[in-house]
């Protein structure tokens, strides 16, 4: 499955440390959350790719991530404050986790619009998207009422599996700033 990090916050200058999600209303079937390890994905890159990516930066954009919402009637007006508060930011494609020291591939399909400079056709970014979304880097969390998931936004992507319609899924989220 594709994991794009639903509320990743990679589009922020200082992304949050982590998130806690509590399942309040859980569908009888479906509605799981997928997690993907960006550090394990980095570990499996060839040495050539690691060296090539080390000096690259990518642009992460709230506007890019919410382009469909912005195109809706009144969307730009509705999200005007969020657009002002979240200008595009540049982050290294390869970041070092501040606690573990492990390197991670710091891109995602939702907010990463492009790599600066050397990737005009998007082939490097598409390679990275395909690489980090491999099943071997993923785990699936199946929710029960009041289950709690905690993850490190600096090294893990997450995405809900939207396969539970017409059932309801209600979560409460706590974001931990770094």
Question: Where are the regions a protein language model picked out?
Answer:
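Non-heme Fe(II) oxygenase catalytic core, chiefly the N-lobe of the double-stranded beta-helix
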Residues: 1-148, 153-178
């Amino acid at each position: 499955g594709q994991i794009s990090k639903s509320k990743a916050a990679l589009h922020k200058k200082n992304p949050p440390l982590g998130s806690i999600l509590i399942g309040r209303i859980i569908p009888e079937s479906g509605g799981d959350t997928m997690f993907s390890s960006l550090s394990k994905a980095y570990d499996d890159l060839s040495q050539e790719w690691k060296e090539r990516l080390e000096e690259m930066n990518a642009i992460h954009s709230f506007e890019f991530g919410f382009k469909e919402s912005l195109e809706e009637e009144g969307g730009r007006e509705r999200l005007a404050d969020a657009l002002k508060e979240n200008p595009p930011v540049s982050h290294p494609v390869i970041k070092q986790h501040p606690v573990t020291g492990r390197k991670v591939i710091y891109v995602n399909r939702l907010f990463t619009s492009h790599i600066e400079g050397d990737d005009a056709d998007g082939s490097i970014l598409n390679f990275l998207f395909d690489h980090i979304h491999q099943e071997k880097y993923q785990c699936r969390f199946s929710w029960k009422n009041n289950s709690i998931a905690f993850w490190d936004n600096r090294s893990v992507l997450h995405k809900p599996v939207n396969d539970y319609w017409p059932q309801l899924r209600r979560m409460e989220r706590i974001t931990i700033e770094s």
